[in-house]
């Protein structure tokens, strides 16, 4: 199981200068969902992991499972 805090930090870094709202809108979720992922309080569903990876032009493994 991936460490939520590590994944959250990766997601924050990938977001860069984009706002939570910009990312949420692109993914079709709420800003709260993105915030919860980035704070390591929740993990996205497997389907959402695929969308996130595509949005950031990365692989699911590199974001959610790579050590």
Task: Label each residue range with its predicted role.
Residues 14, 46-47:
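Short, Lys/Arg-enriched C-terminal cap helix and immediately downstream tail that follows
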Residues 17-36:
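Short alpha-helical DNA-recognition segment
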Residues 12, 21, 50:
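Active-site phosphate/pyrophosphate- and oxyanion-stabilizing loops and adjacent acidic/basic residues
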Residues 1-17, 65:
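A short, Lys/Arg-rich alpha-helix, primarily the initiator
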């Amino acid at each position: 199981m991936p460490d939520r805090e590590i994944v959250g930090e990766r997601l924050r870094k990938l977001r860069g200068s984009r706002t939570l709202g910009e990312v949420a809108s692109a993914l079709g979720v709420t800003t709260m969902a993105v915030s919860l992922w980035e704070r390591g309080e929740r993990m996205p569903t497997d389907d959402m992991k695929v969308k996130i990876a595509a949005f950031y032009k990365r692989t699911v493994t590199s974001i959610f499972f790579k050590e």
